[in-house]
Amino acid sequence: MNGGLEVRVEGTRVVRLVTAPPIAAKVLPGSFGPVVMLVGSAAGLLAGDRLRIRIDLAPGSRLEVRTTAATIAHPCLAGGATAIDVDCHVGAGAVLAWLPEPFIACAGCRHQGRVRLHLDKGARVVWLDTLTLGRTGETAGRVDQRLDVELEGRPLLREGLCLGGDSLDTGAGAAGDVPAVAGPAIAGPAIAGPALVGPAIAGTALVGTARTTPTAGTAIAGPAIAGPAIAGPTAGWDGPAVVGTHRHVAALHLLGRRMPAEIPGAMQLAGPGTTARFLAHRGDELARKVGAVLPLFLQVCSDPDDPLPGPAGERAKEAVHV
């Protein structure tokens, strides 16, 4: 099934909304701006399903995108694969918040996801990706995801995620040398400065090979990666990372603006942006960690001239580390 979504927003109005099964959508009012709520209108994602999502925000407009339920990549038992392709243009001064429910990679799935974000001057985006590795008692299938972000035509973030079904064990006994995450996760290169800067970060899956059994909320704590931006899957970020027993993974990006406060598990990009990583054994644990930081990202994204209150940042630190 080839389905999808096309959205055009001008100011606070959704002026174009076109959907094709298995996607349906409804426009709702929201405090952030209009909310496009995505609803499943048919079974999916099944083998052969390909979804194309196109979002266009006019200068100064705002949009929030949510889903009513998790997106499930079902087993591709007879071959084939599933795919979701998202392409967003965020005009000058416009604001986009992409906040879907988790993506669940079932056993036997083969899924490819590609996201391209094009930000004009002054545009800001909060982008959330949450991944659940298999249903209860399952080993996740294969998931390949790619995120490419450009700000004013120059690269801001390049990130890849590859989860191999046979090589990933998310059961309770998983430990050591788990080649769960591989691929580039890089910032730059067009913006001056190192690709990633900052001290060692706990709670962030650092790409590389290690033999360890991670504790809750921590994959690998390692030193900051400094130097010019990295291009290509073999230039320093090509090794496997340890996910271990964590079945729930989230990436939260603030793009077009940096967080002014230190947030656990977050890294500043070379350009204007902050990215945060979270791992958890349970879905509610991950939701709590993300929920402690997401409002701060939305606040900065919504009103970049309003400084982030200190106590809010402190509460985020406490929640992430509990």
Which residue ranges define each predicted feature?
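N-terminal, charged/glycine-rich beta-strand/loop interface patches
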Residues: M1-P102, A107, A292-L296
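A structural signal for small-residue-enriched, beta-sheet-centric alpha/beta enzyme cores
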Residues: D129-G176, A231-V322
